């Protein structure tokens, strides 16, 4: 059985049907009463939702010990009333959990520009926050979904020193996926004891290598937010580089797992695409090239159609003149098949390339051969299903 957030000691979570959606759980809470640190990464969208602004402000001064989450309504572009509704959600949740309102974050996802049905939310909150019912992480993973087809859950653990350190997380996302500091909604918990400053740095590093390397449709949401709570069960030495690197790698692993699950469940997707860029002169170059390929509608549609037109890859790789790249030294592979070597096409048969494109996971490797920096990005193919889902969404 898959482990969830609530399999980490000191973490409580669940969800309930409040009526925001027609017939599914749509209101959830994560409660970490003993949290010693919390961290968050947020969208930089100019129309950031009130939940983003409120939670970001709380994190600057306090350690969050809970977050109240709703799906089906973004509460974005809803003016002063939207801000008041966000604050009310935090205040009422805090009362029920015996916390300060500044210790409760708020996260929302769904349709933009529609007021929250506060009477439904306030009616459901007391039942949701009953301590005896806060033991269902799986239900919460389902409640945060919108156009997603599947729940997205991760649970990672590793020995650091003599302690078993755990990181668990849930996320949602299927469309409007192109990150700017975060992507969609994501919630992580870990049993480490570190300072807020260190946890924030580690989360930011993990997001930069995972969620920020993810693209379904190049659209950035108004509500993007990833939060992380530390229960404080096991201390790791913040001055010990080996221990800190081990924790950073564990957090990276959890975030990458969640990001790949989002890409695989992209709206209308039939194929997961992974673009690995290696031997670039700078990390920024490797990252930019990977994102250019994963963002390209021409690449996405070619992969969906299993079309071995590799010229679209070359277009995407080289379209930014600021990247330090020598076209005469670039190698490109699709799966195990080398299609470009030293900037020129190989004599590979189109049928061999098409065979690679029939797989469910498409690996594209770009070897710049002139440096030591690497980056990986994830996305999915672009299909008619994407259009159908978004014309029907309301």
Which sequence ranges carry the predicted segments?
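A structural signal for small-residue-enriched, beta-sheet-centric alpha/beta enzyme cores
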Residues: 1-70, 74-84, 94-119, 123-394
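Generic structural marker for isolated residues within well-ordered, non-membrane alpha-helices
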Residues: 90
